[in-house]
Amino acid sequence: MKLIIFTGLVLFAIVSLIEAQAENEKACLPQYQVCTDAPGNCCSNLVCDCYGRYKSGTRIGRNCFCLQKGVIYKREN
């Protein structure tokens, strides 16, 4: 009986460890991917950069994208 309980606890510990490693190794978001709902998931050389959307001076939303660190984007007309 003790062997069955011990085996169950060991299996539970192994499964928990595997799940924790999978959580730490989740895939990062590549460049130009939307990160509005997951700002911390951009790959290491990228940053989640957010922009407000306005129409007639009223804010209508926000967009966030994984972009290169230190790069400034300007609007072209």
UniProtKB/Swiss-Prot annotation:
One of its GO terms (molecular function) is toxin activity. Expressed by the venom gland. Coiled coil: none annotated. It comes from the Eukaryota. Residues 1-20 form the signal peptide. It holds the Pfam family Toxin_35. One of its GO terms (cellular component) is extracellular region. Contains 4 disulfide bonds. It is found in: Secreted. This is U8-lycotoxin-Ls1t. The lineage of its organism: Eukaryota, Metazoa, Ecdysozoa, Arthropoda, Chelicerata.
